[in-house]
Amino acid sequence: MRNFTKQYINGEWVESTSGETLEVINPATEEVAGTIAKGNKEDVEKAVEAADNVYLEFRHTSVKERQDLLDQIVQEYKNRKEDLIQAITDELGAPLSVAENVHYQMGLDHFEAARDALNDFQFEERRGDDLVVKEAIGVSGLITPWNFPTNQTSLKLAAAFAAGSPVVFKPSEETPFAAIILAEIFDKVGVPKGVFNLVNGDGQGVGNPLSEHPKVRMMSFTGSGPTGSSIMKKAAEDFKKVSLELGGKSPYIILDDADIDGAASAAANKVVFNTGQVCTAGTRTIVPASIKEDFLTAVKEKFSQVKVGNPREEGTQVGPIISKKQFDQVQAYIDKGIEEGAELLYGGPGKPEGLDKGYFARPTIFNNVDNSMTIAQEEIFGPVMSVITYNDLDEAIKIANDTKYGLAGYVYGSDKDTLHKVARSIEAGTVEINEAGRKPDLPFGGYKQSGLGREWGDYGIEEFLEVKSIAGYYN
């Protein structure tokens, strides 16, 4: 069992002021996997002061110094690979292969992308006799969700370090182990004291005072819309900059010239990947009437081949839902789909056979879903596909954009002109054509209620900078 009862503040592991702890539950076993410190306002105050004290010094470090720091982090991150994989499997229930090939790898990708972005990043630009300067914004508060313990953490931390902004970081209390390992990595490579501060705890005890602190100049949050809204309101009191990556209800448009087997495989993966606990999950599968029956046969077969189970068993592809609360929410949405008249094609309520222990859900397909139904409009955060039929391309695009969200979209087909038309028409911050995949140097963020700002690569670095113009600098 993992016991981490200290906070990491000003380059040291220190006792949490409250002396209280929180239990972390392994969702695959429903047993306690470890404990962490339950931080409070006093811990946040100490962390912010430490970050504020080092701000000017860190802001004025050279690009090369920060790039070298990121490179050292990359090397030590690789050294801790097995520790990170095991931690993520314990806290999230991610299958070992997913923990390695997705979670661990995405964290590494973001540190490398930020490091490499500094090669060409322009912090200064001459315009005639004048100078435009980009400089670190100052103390930044980071709050990350439970579904990607290294990805969401690394992309924010790497960007802040590259920009020269010290941080106070609150990971999710449900998946804090990987964040603690990152703190150990930073400590070993010598991240300057105060530049990185880790305060574990819950939203009320840590998240709220961090969002409200007058010395915090920027908040970067990934999570639910209601929490993002609450952070914005708190930040508005002293006009903090806010970067938000929130929910999604992403469309996956299948074109009538698509390879059926390839489309079914791609669409199924976008639903069951990470147990459906993905803000970019393509859960609204929008299929042309002309190929719908063939597609349904194929996608049902793909779902039947998915192995749900013990994340430590070889071959497991899908692990548990993160918690009892989240499991119950997924079950409620499945019940709602049935109640509203969608056709249950595969899966349904309850747990897969033989998986009584752990928060395992059945991968589920609903057919004949109307886009106005609850399961088509609200983020479920579980492995649930809603198949919606369209008759022409304009209707497909209209359905895709008929949502309050705009985080991601997908299109699968053969004709390049049609693929391009659809990709440009989807109202979302990220669109993938034929499973192209998102590279870590591309901007990531949402339209509409899916967020504010952009992350990843040089766009992520920009979020942690202020822009200053100096007139007459070269006179």
Curated annotation (Swiss-Prot):
GO terms for molecular function: aldehyde dehydrogenase (NAD+) activity. It comes from Staphylococcus saprophyticus subsp. saprophyticus (strain ATCC 15305 / DSM 20229 / NCIMB 8711 / NCTC 7292 / S-41). The keyword Transferase does not apply. Transmembrane segments: none annotated. InterPro entries: Ald_DH/histidinol_DH, Ald_DH_C, Ald_DH_CS_CYS, Ald_DH_CS_GLU, Ald_DH_N, Aldehyde_DH_dom. It catalyses: an aldehyde + NAD(+) + H2O = a carboxylate + NADH + 2 H(+). It comes from the Bacteria. The active site is at E245, C279. Belongs to the aldehyde dehydrogenase family. Its EC number is 1.2.1.3. Keywords: NAD, Oxidoreductase. NAD(+) binds at G201, D202, G203, Q204, G205, V206, G207. This is Putative aldehyde dehydrogenase SSP0762. PROSITE patterns: ALDEHYDE_DEHYDR_CYS, ALDEHYDE_DEHYDR_GLU.
